[in-house]
Amino acid sequence: MSSSTHRYLIVDLEATCDEHHEIPRDETEIIEIGALLVDGATLAPIEEFNSFVRPVVHPRLTEFCTRLTTISQEDVARAPTFRFVAPKLAAFGQDALFCSWGAYDRSQLERDARRCGIRTPLGPRHLNLKEAFARAAGDRSECGTYAALRRVGLTPDGTHHRGIDDARNIARLLPYALGRLPVPAARTDRRPR
């Protein structure tokens, strides 16, 4: 993506889940949206959006989900449903290029929007930063956010699997994914002979 993009919207979602796959993939629901608006020229954060979302298909969070995300049943029980959060996210990200680390977040937004009978809040334009980072690094395979942070010499901040913290960490990788900073060569575990 060129530097002519005015703003990037980094989105990270957390969704209902369980360790035994009792919740079918097409029934997972967003429980937290973390989004960071980033200036396209400077790549500096401009503003944040963060909201818990109350699930309706599987309203009770599994113990695994709570352990993984640190999101409690109380957090989501008091939250608005996706139908009410989606327009706020759309307004927040208006005219920005929607970005996420991988395709999952885009697919989950589309799935929740379909379930509610509403339009996808962020439209069709999407930049998969996981793919962009792999291309910039010259890698054939993609890596997770934390592995990418370590590769460029950054320490992860915040709590992993929390929407806004993960969005902030992804934003720190934006200059590398866009090719504005070089991605260091991957280190190997092999020792020189």
Predicted regions span which residues?
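Glycine-rich, highly charged phosphate/nucleotide-binding loops
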Residues: 75-84
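N-terminal accessory regions of nucleic-acid-interacting proteins
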Residues: 1-13, 18-20
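Metal-dependent phosphoesterase core characteristic of DEDDh/y 3'-5' exonuclease domains
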Residues: 2, 6-7, 26-33, 37-69, ...
